[in-house]
Design a protein with these regions (language model features):
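N- or domain-start disorder-to-order transition segments that initiate the globular core
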Residues: 1-31
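Residues that act as N-cap/strand-start positions at coil-to-secondary-structure junctions
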Residues: 5-7, 77, 235, 399
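A generic structural signal for well-ordered coil/turn residues at beta-strand boundaries
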Residues: 9, 32, 90, 235-237, ...
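Charge-rich, well-structured scaffold segments of protease-associated domains
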Residues: 14, 22-25, 71-223, 229, ...
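Active/ligand-binding-proximal structured segments within catalytic/core domains
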Residues: 18, 25-76, 150, 263-276, ...
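His/Glu-based metal-binding/catalytic segments typifying zinc-dependent metallopeptidases
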Residues: 22-26, 33-40, 222-281, 287
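Solvent-exposed, non-transmembrane alpha-helical starts
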Residues: 47, 105, 262-264, 324-325
Length: 425
């Protein structure tokens, strides 16, 4: 735990192959949290092949050129470590927890999976079957359907964010081990990766263990330049997708967001909390669920990437309340855009966001996550300490201007998934 008021001492090192390393030693702890983020998320997928990045990442955990999937998992279990690999819009992130004494072995296993995956035919087929099964389950899940439809409304087919990270069923069924290897060679590179460690370990030892584990990780040729195409909404787009045998509707209402590197992003995070991030500190969340009882849940999120990740409000609603829940949400947004928001609203949102940071600092995993955003997007060496002050510095005028710039109430994408909506009288 990082004591309240104390400084997170982040120390950095870069390996000759380009891998950037950041470590925050925390005295009094035996455990460590380890995150390896490779900038190989959706934005780095081949055009027209949504799902390849996630498929590749999942297959990387199914055996290496040195040991099969069971042996690799057994070696991880032997040191009491837990690990996973997730893919988002920007990065493929390997996350693990272990004792500080076992970091060397953990990094060696991590390097095996990331640098020398086998992509054995049997294991590739297993990942394919699991992914197809998940996609089939998602086709009956109103939350997943609403998100898929919303992305299709906002992002054109060639855009990397058009599909969910899990991808398109046709792509998953057709992808070959050779395609996964090609994606791995092109995208999984040390010069686009960041290793972050927080917890009970000294920086010098961590740097030495990382050098030993990742020294052979190399890349062919210069890193491919990538950018995310911009998108905009000229008006309101709406689609209802009927999901059989359901009694609840799920709603996604949203807009294209802004890059994490945009100078207005911190103000956008505060604006998101003022608007609908939860039901305690947010205007729409509190009114729609707690005051009017129109939704089972309400929350909003603002994605982080180098492009316009989704900025969405999500709701679970009785079909008879869908239209009113959406209308009330937009009315609350119009109040913010119109300047009808108070300093109390702002202070409550800032208290919630800074409080979440304080909670995150109580665990190695939370500290590592705070560090990772700053390292991946190169937000400055003092990002972890500066960020709470930046949240507090956001003004009411900035919240209003941010809402006007990015959340126009009359230009939005709306996806509704569930049973048919009742016909209005």
């Amino acid at each position: 735990m990082v004591r309240s008021g104390s400084v997170v001492n982040v120390q950095r090192h870069r390996l000759p192959n380009g891998l950037r390393i950041a470590v925050a030693p925390i005295s009094g702890l035996r455990s460590v949290a380890t995150l390896l983020a490779v900038e190989a998320g959706q934005w780095f997928e081949p055009a027209g092949r949504p799902g390849v990045a996630r498929f590749c990442a999942q297959a990387m955990l199914r055996g290496t050129t040195k040991r099969d999937a069971k042996s690799w998992a057994d070696a991880l279990d032997a040191i009491g470590a837990a690990a996973r690999l997730d893919v988002g819009p920007h990065a493929a992130t390997f996350s693990a927890q272990s004792l500080g004494d076992d970091v060397g072995e953990l990094l060696a296993l991590m390097a095996e999976a990331v640098v020398t995956p086998a992509f054995a035919p049997k294991e590739v087929e297993l990942v394919r079957q699991q992914t197809v099964a998940q996609l089939e389950e998602d086709s009956r899940n109103t939350r997943a359907v609403a998100e898929r439809v919303w992305r299709e409304l906002l992002y054109p087919p060639a855009h990397p964010f058009h599909a969910r990270p899990i991808g398109d069923p046709a792509v998953v069924r057709a992808a070959t081990a050779e395609e996964l290897r090609a994606h791995h060679e092109r995208a999984i590179r040390p010069d686009g990766a960041v290793l972050v460690v927080a917890g009970g370990i000294e920086a010098k030892r961590l740097f030495e263990e990382a050098e030993r584990a990742f020294a052979e990780w190399s890349a062919r040729g210069p890193r491919e330049s990538r950018s995310v195409p911009s998108v905009s909404l000229g008006g309101t787009v709406r689609r209802i997708e009927i999901v059989p045998d359901k009694t609840q509707s799920d709603v996604v209402l949203g807009w294209p967001g802004l890059p994490r590197t945009d100078s207005r992003f911190v103000a956008a995070r505060v604006t998101n909390m003022v608007f609908a991030a939860d039901t305690f500190a947010s205007r729409a969340g509190h009114v729609v669920r707690d005051e009017l009882g129109l939704a089972y849940y309400v929350f909003s999120t603002l994605g982080t990437s180098r492009g316009q990740s989704p900025w969405t409000v999500r709701m679970g609603v009785n079909p008879i309340n869908v239209e009113r829940a959406v209308s009330v949400t937009l009315d609350e947004l119009r109040k913010i855009v119109g300047g009808k928001v108070s300093e109390d609203d702002l202070e409550l949102a800032q208290d919630k966001l800074v409080g979440e940071l304080d909670v995150a600092r109580e665990s190695p995993g939370g500290v590592a996550s705070l560090m990772l955003e700053g390292e991946v997007f190169e937000l400055g060496p003092d990002h972890v300490e500066r960020y709470p002050r930046e949240l507090r510095a956001v003004t009411l005028d900035q919240v209003i201007e941010t809402a006007r710039a990015f959340l126009p109430p009359d230009r939005h994408a709306l996806a509704i998934a569930g049973p048919p909506l009742p016909v209005a009288d």
